[in-house]
């Protein structure tokens, strides 16, 4: 062998191999599914490349993957005639995990979490699953279009390093030989192999063939005759009639498609004929991928044109807020030589995207209606992503809004379980708007003084504490004809909720007019306005913003993104019935008066923002007033 060298695995590969071998052992037969799935992908890629370069078939266009056993050597070999790999591709594909953030993710996980097979499965372990049952793996491969002496040899015991070399390989494709560990001989049994392949890979388009040996029927001959028996249907699952496909087949196809170990929550298989002809098979996963928030996270549908594989991760067919949807689309209206650039500008693509988006949203609506518990499980995994749809997809705004879930004052749990339809159904007589509050946490939202009057009136308030919520509400302006209203903003509808003023209240307010003017004079330009309010019951003062001003939470979003935000000028609202306000109003000494006004304002700012510009000064002032 020429060019032989020993190279070390990328550190993440070593860690993942160790974890995978131990965490996936109880489900060890999945290595068959993963390796056959890889062979299927290799065949798909060759078919696509051969559309423009038919010579890549090298006279062998019958694509398949073959399994053969050697019981004496205790080896199991997978051999395909797909696209194959060059030396650089072998190093990239078998020596590294080309996923940004993998190392940081592995380091952030506790040992117990990393024993979770579903978590490990999120990495798309693929080829590495061979080491669950093998103590050594040998790969021989040659890329389509390369010369016979352009083959590559790769071998590893799945520990710290691997050997790579140049070899001569007459046939195109990849051959993977597993040297089985002690106790894994059942995978040398034909019946066992057929059973597992039938379970996991019946839906694979690529024919899966198993080697069978029998004695020659010619008289006097001792020769063995080798034949290849096809053991799967080898028909694209999505082209079959829905009535002929079992739930288990749909679930296994999802695992093949997504390399996810969990079963999907739901799926939708549809064939559309007419103005556009296409077949789609969409899945809603049960678990979010570990790198869903990574900018380089690949998402999108697998694209076929007239049953010919074109590309993975075609993100042009699904909006970004539905990036968790898995599946495929097989179109009859796109050209076979379609590129990502053509897809981006294609009217066909835009029409398909619109139809598939509505399909995915209807799947979620059906899940929410038929199984609230399952939908709640979905929301915990993907709710934050779905909230992006309020701003990204105004066309389907109402459909997205119906799928949103929030915490509210209706219950005592931070769980986001309340739909907008449920909220509207519970609105009290005379209530015109949907009230909400945004805060840094559920606890801060629930205990906000802005809720006092609404609680007294029995009016439900939605409690928002996710970072995205404030951004979302800049787009989500109404639902079912009802406008949304932040309770931390000044609004006439909130003032209307206060009890009708009696003569006594009017007299109190008139008597406090000089006090309000005195506070205004003292604070000057630090606040936008000072006024009395009847929206409070237990709190002496709050700060609010005008309807058109930036909110506190939005300013925090700007700051977190490193962007400058305009300074917020708050409206300082005082509760005329509170003892501390009355006490402050009766102070004649300007120094004491100033201290009490500062204390009331700082309390209001602390409740609104969660922080103060000078907390030490606030503490000193409070201690001083307590000792007075």
UniProtKB/Swiss-Prot annotation:
* Annotated GO CC locations: cytoplasm
Q: Where is this region: C?
A: 557-628
Q: Where found, per UniProt?
A: Cytoplasm
Annotated GO molecular function terms are:
ATP binding; ATP hydrolysis activity; ATP-dependent protein folding chaperone; unfolded protein binding
Show the Gene3D superfamilies listed in the entry.
3.30.230.80, 3.40.50.11260, Heat shock protein 90, C-terminal domain, Histidine kinase-like ATPase, C-terminal domain
Q: Where is the region B?
A: 341-556
Cysteine-cysteine disulfides: none
State the InterPro entries in the record: HATPase_C_sf, Heat_shock_protein_90_CS, HSP90_C, Hsp90_fam, Hsp90_N, Ribosomal_Su5_D2-typ_SF
Q: Where are the transmembrane segments?
A: none
Q: Which domain of life is it from?
A: Bacteria
Q: Do you know which SUPFAM superfamilies this protein is assigned to?
A: ATPase domain of HSP90 chaperone/DNA topoisomerase II/histidine kinase, HSP90 C-terminal domain, Ribosomal protein S5 domain 2-like
Keywords recorded for this protein, A-Z:
ATP-binding, Chaperone, Cytoplasm, Nucleotide-binding, Stress response
Using the UniProt annotation, give all residue ranges assigned to the region (A).
Answer: 1-340
Q: What's the family?
A: Belongs to the heat shock protein 90 family.
Provide the function of this protein.
Answer: Molecular chaperone. Has ATPase activity.
Quaternary state and partners of this protein?
Answer: Homodimer.
Q: What is this protein called?
A: Chaperone protein HtpG
**Organism expressing this protein natively:** Sodalis glossinidius (strain morsitans)
Record gene name: htpG
């Amino acid at each position: 062998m020429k060019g032989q060298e020993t190279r070390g695995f990328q550190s993440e590969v070593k860690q993942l191999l160790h974890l995978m071998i131990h965490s996936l052992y109880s489900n060890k037969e999945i290595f068959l599914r993963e390796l056959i799935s890889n062979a299927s992908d290799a065949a798909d890629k060759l078919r696509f490349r051969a559309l423009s370069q038919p010579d890549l078939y090298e006279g062998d266009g019958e694509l398949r993957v073959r399994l053969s056993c050697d019981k004496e050597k205790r080896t199991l070999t997978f051999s395909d005639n797909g696209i194959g790999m060059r030396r650089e591709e072998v190093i990239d594909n078998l020596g590294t995990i080309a996923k940004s953030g993998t190392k940081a993710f592995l380091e952030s996980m506790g040992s117990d979490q990393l024993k979770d097979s579903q978590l490990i499965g999120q990495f798309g372990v693929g080829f590495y699953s061979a080491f669950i049952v093998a103590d050594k793996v040998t790969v021989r491969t040659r890329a389509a279009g390369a010369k016979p002496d352009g083959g590559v040899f790769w071998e590893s015991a799945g520990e710290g390093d691997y050997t790579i070399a140049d070899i001569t390989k007459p046939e195109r494709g990849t051959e993977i030989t597993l040297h089985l560990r002690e106790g894994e001989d059942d995978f040398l049994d034909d019946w066992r192999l057929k059973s597992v392949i039938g379970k996991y890979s019946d839906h694979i388009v690529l024919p899966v063939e198993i080697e069978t040996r029998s004695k020659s029927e010619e008289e006097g001959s001792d020769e063995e005759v080798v034949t290849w028996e096809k053991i799967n249907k080898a028909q694209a699952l999505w082209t079959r009639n829905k009535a002929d496909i079992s739930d288990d087949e749909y679930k296994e196809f999802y695992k093949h498609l997504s390399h996810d170990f969990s079963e999907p929550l739901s799926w939708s298989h549809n064939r559309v004929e007419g103005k556009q002809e296409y077949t789609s098979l969409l899945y809603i996963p049960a678990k979010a991928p570990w790198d869903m928030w990574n900018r380089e996270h690949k998402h999108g549908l697998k694209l076929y044109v007239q049953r010919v594989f074109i590309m993975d991760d075609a993100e042009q067919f699904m909006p970004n807020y539905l990036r968790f949807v898995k599946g495929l689309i097989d179109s009859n209206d796109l050209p076979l030589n379609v590129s990502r650039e053509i897809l981006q500008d294609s009217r066909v693509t835009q029409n398909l995207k619109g139809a598939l988006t509505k399909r995915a949203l209807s799947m979620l609506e059906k899940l929410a209606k038929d199984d609230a518990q399952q939908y709640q499980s979905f929301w915990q995994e993907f709710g934050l992503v779905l909230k992006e749809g309020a701003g990204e997809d105004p066309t389907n705004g109402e459909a997205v809004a119906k799928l949103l879930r929030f915490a509210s004052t209706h219950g005592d749990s931070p769980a986001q379980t309340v739909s907008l339809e449920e909220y509207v159904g519970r609105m009290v007589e005379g209530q015109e708007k949907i009230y909400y509050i945004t805060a840094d946490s559920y606890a801060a939202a629930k205990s906000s003084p802005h809720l006092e009057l609404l609680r007294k009136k029995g009016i439900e308030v939605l409690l928002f504490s996710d970072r995205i919520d404030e951004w979302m509400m800049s787009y989500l302006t109404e639902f079912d004809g009802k406008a949304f209203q932040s309770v931390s903003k000044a609004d006439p509808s909130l003032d209307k909720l206060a009890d009708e003023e009696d003569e006594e209240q009017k007299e109190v307010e008139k008597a406090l007019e000089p006090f309000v003017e005195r506070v205004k004079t003292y604070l000057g330009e630090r606040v936008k306005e000072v006024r009395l309010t009847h929206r409070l019951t237990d709190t002496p003062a709050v700060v609010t913003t005008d309807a058109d001003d930036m909110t506190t939470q939005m300013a925090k979003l700007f700051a977190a993104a490193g962007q400058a935000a305009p300074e917020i000028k708050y409206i300082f609202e005082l509760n005329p019935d509170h003892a501390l306000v009355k006490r402050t109003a009766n102070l004649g000494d300007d120094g004491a008066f100033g201290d009490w006004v500062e204390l009331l304002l700082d309390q209001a700012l602390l409740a609104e923002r969660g922080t103060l510009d000078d907390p030490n000064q606030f503490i000193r002032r409070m201690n001083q007033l307590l000792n007075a």
